[in-house]
Amino acid sequence: XXEVAPEILDVXQF
């Protein structure tokens, strides 16, 4: 993830 909303989908993958 971390494509559209990294802070919501996966914070660890900014």
UniProtKB/Swiss-Prot annotation:
Keywords: Chloroplast, Plastid, Thylakoid. GO terms for cellular component: chloroplast thylakoid. The keyword Thylakoid applies. The keyword Plastid applies. It comes from the Eukaryota. It is found in: Plastid, Chloroplast thylakoid. On the 2D-gel the determined pI of this protein is: 8.5, its MW is: 16.9 kDa. This is Unknown protein from spot 251 of 2D-PAGE of thylakoid. It comes from Pisum sativum.
